[in-house]
Amino acid sequence: APSGLVLAIDEKGNELVVQNADKPFVPASVTKIVTAWLAMEVLGGDYRFETRFYLNGDRVLYIRGGGDPFLISEELAQLASELVVAIGKKPLSGIVLDASYYPSDIRIPGIEDTDEAYDALNSALAVNFNTIHAVREGKTIRSAEKQTPITPLAISQFRARGPQGRGRISL
């Protein structure tokens, strides 16, 4: 894999140990340390991303994503139960998904367009980290996680891009 570094800078600002310092790279995992520190400083340890639910008079449910990185199947199951209590069992006339909290045209230098789960783009309404974890058995594709139902979209995406056997792909 390509790499680059600036390991040491002297008191005058001269780079002492340098390799490919001017080439752009996907940030290494250690970058997450600085990101986490900054998030704790700015947002605080009690900050939680929100997914908001609104029901209008015509019984259309609006779901507005707020960038929750841990919106996963287990959380959705709990939210569904809470929604039934809050809005009753009368059928909905529609559901509108709103992912407009983040701009849709975000481009991050170094991010590659691959099927690898670690390359999945984030969004304001990402579910299960914008990935599909499935199993291909012959012509059948099923969820690899008992708590995660598989949708027709997930099946078609995994059929087109997923590996034989068990695997995870980005959406």
What are these regions (language model features)?
Residues 25-39:
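Active/ligand-binding-proximal structured segments within catalytic/core domains
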Residues 41-171:
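Conserved serine DD-peptidase/penicillin-binding transpeptidase domain
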Residues 1-27, 43-46, 82-89:
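Beta-lactamase-like hydrolase cores
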Residues 3, 15-18, 35, 65, ...:
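Generic, low-specificity signal for short hydrophobic/alpha-helical stretches with a mild N-terminal bias
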